[in-house]
Amino acid sequence: ASPSSEVTAAPAASKRWFEELLEIKNELYSEHLFQIQFSINSTDPAQRDHMMPIAKMSFDEISKFGKRFVRRGERKAALNFTTVKGLDYDADVIARHFSPEHFCVKMTPLNPTESADEAGLRSSFEEIAEPFAEKLTGHGFDVILSIGDLKENEIGSNCGQSVRRLHKSI
């Protein structure tokens, strides 16, 4: 099987889907080639709700699922944070809810999309990433700082920008 991954905001209504995904992963990806990534974006529940206005699993629910999903020697589940100015990033909250044995943390800059501009969101990767990463590693977490190809920003091909432009032109 080829390496595969799934990125999700962990919709609460999709718990059955997650169970099916776990079965598929265990049956078809026995070579540790599957990773799941949960979009977290903030450690403050109200801010998280604002960023992702859907019913979603709590940190504890994500943690319980991740512990079942990741077996010894497999890729850790990733907790993804898009670094946005003004949001809370508290390593102690992550450490209270998640195990560094089963989870790693990935931080990405907010891409300068039309949607981000309309919402007044600004990236603060430089201000947030290093201090947050330092505190997380102090709690035993592996941390990934992930900066995409900046050419994607220039040509507008990240985060669904191309689809949005196409939709507006139709």
Language model features with spans:
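Auxiliary Fe-S-binding modules of radical SAM enzymes
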Residues: 64-170
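Core AdoMet radical
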Residues: 1-72, 76-85, 104-108
